[in-house]
């Protein structure tokens, strides 16, 4: 959810995803400054709510200032607020925008850099209370550390984390996965296509307007971008062998990198949804998977 989107097309994309068997719809208040949740809510009017796992997030605030500035989005200053009051208010408002009486998963979007300001115990207790009330079904956290994961489990529970993970961004393998396995926390990966870089459509000559988030993405810097393009070019024979797109190949491999990984793929149009869905039926031969993982390891 960034840049220009056609709302009707977005609703159609969500409907297409559910028709194709996609069950998890993820959004957040910060995406489009509430607009994403409103669009998802419109789509849910035409979808059997029981068919989908619906997740959204809390903890980012732009109606009032807090001591923790997160970033500026489209000229609006966004702050982090992990207080119990903010979390509970966020959920009540998200439920209204989404037109539902419960969330299947609630994530804290970003964690507080100062636990003295927003004690983790207070944050978790608020989420546990919402779960007891039936307003959320599972507790999630995004952009965490191993210590934060342990803190959630100490003060209540943590069902799932949502972290950036791709063939180019693999920090969670060593930093978070051991803790998640120990404590039984599931993992959902966002940005598996690295903002489009791993679709095979980006070249060294591709440029983006000022302010585009890709310009600050380390994977888009010249050296790393060249590695990514060379990696994908080396798999041209595999896209031919499996009759698939580069994006489908990358999604299929990403899902195999971590057992039980939930791969969250963004899509603006029904066509992009269908391309993503095609990765589900792609079964990589053992030798091909080993080869591709070796290629990925060689640039890590």
What are these regions (language model features)?
Residues 1-7, 72-88, 114-116:
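Active-site mouth loops of central-metabolism enzymes
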Residues 1-2, 57-77, 107:
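N-terminal small/glycine-rich loop or linker at the start of catalytic domains
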């Amino acid at each position: 959810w960034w840049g220009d989107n056609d709302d009707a097309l977005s609703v159609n994309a969500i409907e297409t995803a559910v028709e194709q068997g996609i069950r998890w719809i993820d959004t957040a208040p910060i995406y489009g400054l509430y607009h994403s949740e409103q669009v998802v809510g419109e789509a849910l009017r035409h979808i059997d709510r029981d068919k989908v796992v619906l997740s959204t997030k809390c903890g980012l605030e732009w109606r009032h200032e807090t001591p923790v500035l997160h970033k500026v989005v489209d000229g609006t200053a966004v702050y982090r607020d992990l207080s119990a009051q903010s979390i509970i208010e966020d959920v009540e408002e998200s439920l209204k925008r989404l037109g539902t009486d419960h969330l299947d998963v609630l994530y804290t979007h970003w964690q507080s850099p100062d636990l003295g300001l927003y004690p983790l115990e207070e944050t978790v207790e608020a989420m546990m209370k919402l779960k007891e009330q039936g307003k959320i079904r599972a507790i999630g956290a995004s952009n965490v550390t191993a210590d934060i994961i342990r803190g959630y489990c100490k003060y209540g529970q943590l069902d799932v984390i949502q972290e950036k993970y791709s063939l180019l961004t693999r920090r969670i393998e060593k930093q978070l996965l051991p803790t998640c396995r120990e404590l039984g926390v599931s993992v959902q990966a966002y940005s598996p296509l690295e903002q489009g870089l791993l679709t095979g459509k980006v070249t060294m000559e591709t440029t983006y307007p000022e302010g585009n988030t890709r310009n600050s993405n380390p994977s888009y810097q010249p050296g790393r971008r060249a590695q990514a393009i060379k990696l994908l070019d080396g798999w041209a024979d595999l896209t031919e062998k499996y009759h698939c797109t580069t994006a489908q190949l990358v999604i299929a491999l990403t899902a195999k990198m971590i057992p039980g990984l939930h791969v969250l793929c963004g899509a603006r149009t029904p066509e992009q949804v269908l391309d993503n869905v095609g990765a589900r039926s792609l079964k990589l031969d053992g030798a091909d998977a080993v080869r591709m993982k070796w290629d990925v390891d060689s640039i890590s």
